[in-house]
C-alpha cells in the first residue's frame, strides 16, 4: 500500500510557518563531512526521506551517522571506503555528491549511477570532465561512475553550463588538491554558498562563492565543524505560491528573502502584496491572481524547482501565461496531471501555454517527482471537492511534514493509504 494525500479545496490559507534547512544543501553538506576525519554536526536539517538515505550511503563508506530530529552527526574515520553501495545510492540523485569527496580523500571513487526524480536527463559529463582536469581518470563501468587519481592538482576549469552538482563535486575534489583551482561559469545558488561556507569553516581556502568564478587553493587537511544548514528557498517559495493561489496570507520565516528575489517579484506582478524581513517574508493575495510569464534559469533566475508551483498558479490566474523550461526537458510531464484537474494548458516543446480558469475540478492525480507533487497539492487547494494526490513518497523526499504544515495554515489535507 502507498500513501496518498486527500486535499479538500476552497480554504484560504493563513498563518505563519518556518522553513527548515534546504534539501538541496543538507545532502551535499553530509557528503562534505567525508573530507574531515572526526565528528561533523549539522543543525537545522530537514526531516525528509532523503536524509536517512544519505545517512545509509555514508554508513556504507565507514562513517557513523546519528539522526536526532533536525540534528545530524557524522563521525568520519581516518580511513574510509571508496565504493558507494548500489542499493543506497540508487534511491536518489544527490548521492552522486560523494564523488568529489571520495576522489579527494581516497584518490578513488566508485559510485553507482543514481536514481531520483524523473524530470529529464541530468548527465554526469561535466562532473567527469572537471575531475579529469584535476588529474583523475573517469569511466562508466558496470552501472557505476569510477574515478581514480594518483594525485589531484589544481586546474583552470570552465563549465559549459553552471551545473550545481558539477560545481559541488569539483569544489569538494579541489579543496584537498595541490595548487590552485579556478572554476569559471560556476553555479551561484545559495546552496553552493552554504557548502563553501562550511568548507571554509573546515579550513578550506575558497574565494568567490556566489559569483561566476570560484577560486580554490588546496590545503593538506580539513577539520570537522558544526554548521547550520541554510533555509530551504524552494519550500519557502512553495508557501509563497500557496498564499497566492488560495488568496491567503502567509508569513514565512527561516529564509533570506534575497534568495527568492525574482520569485517574490513575479508574485507582485500577479497581484500579491509582499513584505520582506531580514529572515523571512509575507505574501498576501486578496484578488484573483493575474497571468504572468515565466522562464526557468540558473540562479539568480527563476528556479526550475518552483516551475510546477508557478504553473499551478497560472491555471487559476486571469489571462494567458507562457512558461518556458530551460533546465530539464521532461519537467512538463506533470502538466497532463494538471489537465485532469481541468487546467487549460497546451505543451509546445519547452513551452507550456496556460489560459487561466476561475476554478479547477477535483480528480485523482499522480505525482512524478517532488516538486510536481507539491504543485498538484497546491492545485487541489483551489479545486472543488476532494483531490487525491497519489505517489506522495516523492513529496516526502523534499517537504517535511507537508500535510501537518498545510493543516497548521487552515488547509484540509489528510494522509491515507490506498
UniProtKB/Swiss-Prot annotation:
GO terms for biological process: cell division; cell wall organization; peptidoglycan biosynthetic process; regulation of cell shape; UDP-N-acetylgalactosamine biosynthetic process. Phosphoenolpyruvate binds at residues 23-24. Its EC number is 2.5.1.7. GO terms for cellular component: cytoplasm. SUPFAM superfamilies: EPT/RTPC-like (SSF55205). GO terms for molecular function: UDP-N-acetylglucosamine 1-carboxyvinyltransferase activity. The active site is at residue 117. Pfam families: EPSP_synthase. It comes from the Bacteria. It is found in: Cytoplasm. Pathway: Cell wall biogenesis; peptidoglycan biosynthesis. InterPro entries: Enolpyruvate_Tfrase_dom (IPR001986), Enolpyruvate_Tfrase_sf (IPR036968), MurA_subfamily (IPR050068), RNA3'P_cycl/enolpyr_Trfase_a/b (IPR013792), UDP_GlcNAc_COvinyl_MurA (IPR005750). Keywords: Cell cycle, Cell division, Cell shape, Cell wall biogenesis/degradation, Cytoplasm, Peptidoglycan synthesis, Transferase. It catalyses: phosphoenolpyruvate + UDP-N-acetyl-alpha-D-glucosamine = UDP-N-acetyl-3-O-(1-carboxyvinyl)-alpha-D-glucosamine + phosphate. Transmembrane segments: none annotated. Cell wall formation. Adds enolpyruvyl to UDP-N-acetylglucosamine. This is UDP-N-acetylglucosamine 1-carboxyvinyltransferase. It comes from Corynebacterium jeikeium (strain K411).
Amino acid at each position: 500500500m502507498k500513501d496518498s494525500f486527500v486535499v479538500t479545496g476552497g480554504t484560504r490559507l493563513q498563518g505563519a510557518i518556518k522553513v527548515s534547512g534546504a534539501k538541496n544543501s543538507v545532502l551535499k553538506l553530509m557528503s562534505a563531512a567525508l573530507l574531515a576525519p572526526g565528528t561533523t554536526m549539522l543543525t537545522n536539517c530537514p526531516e525528509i526521506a532523503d536524509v536517512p538515505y544519505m545517512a545509509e550511503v555514508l554508513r556504507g563508506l565507514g562513517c557513523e551517522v546519528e539522526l536526532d530530529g533536525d540534528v545530524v552527526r557524522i563521525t568520519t574515520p581516518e580511513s574510509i571506503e571508496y565504493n558507494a553501495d548500489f542499493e543506497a545510492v540508487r534511491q536518489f540523485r544527490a548521492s552522486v555528491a560523494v564523488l568529489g569527496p571520495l576522489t579527494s580523500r581516497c584518490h578513488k571513487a566508485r559510485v553507482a549511477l543514481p536514481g531520483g526524480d524523473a524530470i529529464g536527463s541530468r548527465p554526469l559529463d561535466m562532473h567527469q570532465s572537471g575531475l579529469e582536469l584535476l588529474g583523475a581518470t573517469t569511466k562508466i563501468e558496470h552501472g557505476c561512475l569510477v574515478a581514480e587519481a594518483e594525485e589531484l592538482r589544481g586546474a583552470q576549469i570552465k563549465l559549459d553550463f553552471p551545473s550545481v552538482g558539477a560545481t559541488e563535486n569539483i569544489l569538494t575534489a579541489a579543496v584537498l588538491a595541490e595548487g590552485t583551482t579556478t572554476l569559471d561559469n560556476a553555479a551561484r545558488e545559495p546552496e553552493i554558498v552554504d557548502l563553501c561556507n562550511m568548507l571554509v569553516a573546515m579550513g578550506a581556502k575558497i574565494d568567490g562563492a556566489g559569483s561566476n568564478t570560484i577560486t580554490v587553493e588546496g590545503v593538506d587537511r580539513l577539520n570537522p565543524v558544526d554548521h547550520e544548514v541554510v533555509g530551504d528557498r524552494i519550500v519557502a517559495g512553495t508557501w509563497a505560491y500557496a498564499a497566492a493561489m488560495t488568496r491567503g496570507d502567509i508569513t514565512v520565516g527561516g529564509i533570506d528573502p534575497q534568495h527568492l528575489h525574482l520569485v517574490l517579484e513575479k508574485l507582485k506582478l500577479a497581484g500579491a502584496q509582499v513584505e520582506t524581513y531580514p529572515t523571512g517574508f509575507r505574501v498576501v493575495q486578496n484578488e484573483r491572481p493575474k497571468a504572468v510569464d515565466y522562464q526557468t534559469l540558473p540562479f539568480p533566475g527563476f528556479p526550475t524547482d518552483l516551475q510546477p508551483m508557478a504553473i499551478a498558479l497560472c491555471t487559476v490566474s486571469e489571462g494567458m501565461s507562457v512558461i518556458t523550461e530551460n533546465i530539464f526537458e521532461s519537467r512538463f510531464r506533470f502538466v497532463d496531471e494538471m489537465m485532469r484537474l481541468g487546467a487549460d494548458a497546451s505543451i509546445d516543446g519547452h513551452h507550456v501555454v496556460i489560459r487561466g480558469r476561475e476554478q479547477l475540478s477535483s480528480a485523482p492525480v499522480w505525482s512524478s517527482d517532488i516538486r510536481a507533487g507539491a504543485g498538484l497539492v497546491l492545485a487541489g487547494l483551489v479545486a472543488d471537492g476532494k483531490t487525491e494526490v497519489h505517489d506522495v513518497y516523492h513529496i516526502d523526499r523534499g517537504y517535511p511534514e507537508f500535510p501537518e504544515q498545510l493543516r497548521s495554515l487552515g488547509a484540509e489535507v489528510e494522509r491515507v493509504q490506498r
